[in-house]
Amino acid sequence: MTEFYVDNLSYALGSVKRTVDESAKSDTFSSAKLLRDSGFETHHLAAEGESVLDLAVKAVGPIRGSLTELHAIIWASCIPENATVGDRVQFERSRDVKPLMDFPASRLQSHLDAPQAIVLGLVQQACTSMLGSVRVACGLLTTEGDFENILCLTSDCFPSGAKYEQSYSLISDGAACCVVSRKPEGYRILACHQITNGAAVQASDEETAAVYFTYMNRIVNETLAKAKMT
């Protein structure tokens, strides 16, 4: 069986650093005490004008030297509007949809000078989109015999005015990336697995917390079984 590996992990956070107390004044649902008791201390937000593309460029910076032979870039977005850096005002003015298809993954490909790399976008998987990109990368390496290195990247900023909290977790703006390849370096991927419950797409925070441990127990056991581990 072909083996795949994850290596060259890197990340970047929004340029504005706050304390939990500062963010809890207006940008969270929970109190500062509850967030601190949950383990949160600092909060990072994108600066004004700092885009998901900017964060992505910052994230790949430390591993730039390892990205010289990319065959694919998979950009994973949690929030759908982060899948484009296009100008909606320009679209409304011109009524041409082209500005809405100004994809950050294509811009990142150009920034990395990787014209040989195909570009894919992944969305509608929320906070597990990065894990989904790794699974897609393994699929590409399986079917495309000439592919060797695939950059998986996720980058998200909350929209202006949003509360930076989901399911009692404080969320920062940021980006993260890794390279999935056949080279036996970094971490070997033993198995990929996921569970999708489409009926729970708009579940409340309370409902999400209620089913979390049930699903975690199930998915951990199913993943271990798939990897033939106990």
Residue ranges and their predicted role:
Residues T28, A32-L53, P80-E148:
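Conserved catalytic cysteine-centered active-site region
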Residues A56-I63, S133-L141, V179, V220:
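Buried hydrophobic packing segments
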Residues G132, V136-G139, C152-A175, R218:
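Active-site glycine-rich loop that binds ribose-phosphate moieties when present
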Residues M1-G49, Y164-K226:
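Condensing-enzyme catalytic core mediating Claisen C-C bond formation in acyl metabolism
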Residues K58-H71, R218-T230:
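Phosphate/pyrophosphate-binding loops at sites that engage ATP/ADP/AMP, CoA/4′-phosphopantetheine
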Residues Y5-D7, H71-I74, N149-L151:
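Conserved beta-strand elements of the Class I
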Residues A12, A76-E81, Q124-T128, T154-P159:
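Acidic, glycine-rich active-site loops and adjacent beta-strand->loop/helix elements
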